[in-house]
Amino acid sequence: MKSWVFVLGLSLFSPEPIQSGPTERSFEMIEPRQLLNHVVRPTLAQLEIDGDTAEKLVMGTIAHESKLGTYLKQIQGPALGICQMEPPTHDDIWHNWLRYRPAMTEQLLKFVPMWAMEGKTEPDARLLITSLEYAVAMCRIHY
């Protein structure tokens, strides 16, 4: 059975191409199926906390919070990345949740480049902006 998710008026699982045209207020976004197939689904599978519900949750968050990747930093606020996670939330997950779950921490660190960990015990929240996979992984862990 095919699943359908409608986000910003777009069907994420539709076999038809999404048509876009000029609008009064246009913005650029990441094409939803590409984001799902090339970032969200593989990231969740590698974390081993995947599935249809998890995909919908993360894609819905991305659609709502950043308009499908239009914004990598909240315009008048601290939230970062395609899932718009605030740095204190990021840090709290590392300090109060991941530190007690070494297996999940090990999985998450696969999305963190080595340079981001030099001399640190956890990555800086700014990695949420530069790594789509890391942002998706942190979003899923947050839920």
Map each language-model feature to its residues.
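Sec-dependent N-terminal signal peptides
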Residues: 4-12
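C-terminal segment of classical bacterial N-terminal signal peptides
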Residues: 15-16
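Peptidoglycan-targeting cell-wall enzymes and recognition modules
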Residues: 23-39, 44, 63-143
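Catalytic phosphate/metal-binding cores of nucleic-acid and nucleotide-processing enzymes, i.e., regions
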Residues: 46-52, 60-63
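Alpha-helix N-cap/helix-initiation sites
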Residues: 50-55, 75
